């Protein structure tokens, strides 16, 4: 085997963010995050998907096709503790994504979704979808609120089906009691169930009808950024949420299965919805300029939301006061995003607009890392303060539909990866539970020369929130965030996940 470094094909955290699964051109590895260390690996060929089920010994594996046993159409479920294969399932086309919780296993192909009972690996249901080449879907880790969300393609919908409307009147064909034959190479899994879904095609397939036509007096509209919410227990779609104007780039479901976060392909606006009602309860603004969003992740307590993108900066948003007291009509959603994408106004959160009325907020300014002080950041920080005053003044003058443009909260904290190269680096992140940090162990971090920061960090032990980031160039970065002040996250350590 060559001594050259393997190519990374897949990286992900487990559902709790405590482990990392890595698939390379040479094999796969499983790492523990704290303390950091490798606890399982195999050098058996190239792997495209390596998914964990929490911290159990169960792994879902998909190869890259460099050898017959590792076909990209074959899903292999293994037990790492017993070094045994639990089952194998071969699908008609390449597998793009696999998600699991303790009740369900979901396999996404480009035009189909297969849902299995994870305890028996019995095929429960098959969904026909429009092409989903990015393999976008998100699944709730919770069994109590077990949901699957995936993007709905651009389609023509009669106006009687409004945004956030339930779709219980839409009939789904549910896979019967057909047992799936495992360890098979030629038979297509669930093939007999796919033909039964033609009646469902109007909901999941692109509608070729003329968008200007009408049906029974009902006007038609085109939706491009819709998300389908699917209940994995009842095996029924529950809702279509109009998340964005443009194409969906990333999505995530909170640990308890109650919230869904989405980002569009422009990457300027992040929205959070109540997955039960479809109400938009948070809207965050990542930045002014468009960027490619790679991942969205909730903290386990749903207090924070981390967003990674092509800018090599990770933004953390705080889920505090929702927008429920100032809800917007569904028509306002498009107006907000269009303005947010084109506007150069650097807005801030509603809570931050009342600095003068909240002296405790002024006393606890966001922490600023001295090593990241640049002229651009200083100008931006100054403009944010001016924007707060401007937004507060304008909010008293303009009606709700105009002031809604100012309501997108900006990030609570951020971190910049210490990557000097300009090469393309993809990242994913995970937010951990608060931990105690002994400041004496990191004197170079907590004695920055900033008088305000030094005064606040004189405490010997501080409560901090860990932020873990894994990059496609093979590094794990451990940061910590001040849960009270936010600002710049501090890097504690970094490890290579490619070196043995």
Curated annotation (Swiss-Prot):
**Impact of mutating residue 313 to A?**
Impairs membrane-association
Q: Which residues cross the membrane?
A: none
Q: Annotated motif L/FRRG motif: location in the chain?
A: 284-288
Q: What would be an example GO MF term here?
A: ubiquitin binding
* Amino acid composition bias (Basic and acidic residues), ranges on this chain: 181-194
Tree of life domain: Eukaryota
GO CC, sorted alphabetically, is: cell periphery; cytosol; endosome; endosome membrane; fungal-type vacuole membrane; PAS complex; phagophore; phagophore assembly site
Task: Enumerate composition-biased segments (Acidic residues).
Answer: 331-344
- Explain what the record says happens when changing residue 286 to A: Impairs membrane-association
What topology in the membrane does the UniProt record assign? Peripheral membrane protein
Q: Where in the cell is it found?
A: Preautophagosomal structure membrane; Vacuole membrane; Endosome membrane
Spans annotated as Disordered: 174-197, 328-358
* Outcome of mutating residue 268 to A: Impairs membrane-association
InterPro entries, alphabetized: PROPPIN, WD40/YVTN_repeat-like_dom_sf, WD40_repeat_dom_sf, WD40_rpt
Q: State how changing residue 315 to A affects the protein, per the record.
A: Impairs membrane-association
Question: Family per UniProt?
Answer: Belongs to the WD repeat PROPPIN family.
Extra remark: Present with 1560 molecules/cell in log phase SD medium.
On assembly, the entry states:
Component of the PI(3,5)P2 regulatory complex, composed of ATG18, FIG4, FAB1, VAC14 and VAC7. VAC14 nucleates the assembly of the complex and serves as a scaffold. Interacts with ATG2, the ATG2-ATG18 complex being essential for autophagosome formation. Interacts with ATG9. Also interacts with VAC17.
State the protein's name.
Autophagy-related protein 18
Q: Which organism is it from?
A: Saccharomyces cerevisiae (strain ATCC 204508 / S288c) (Baker's yeast)
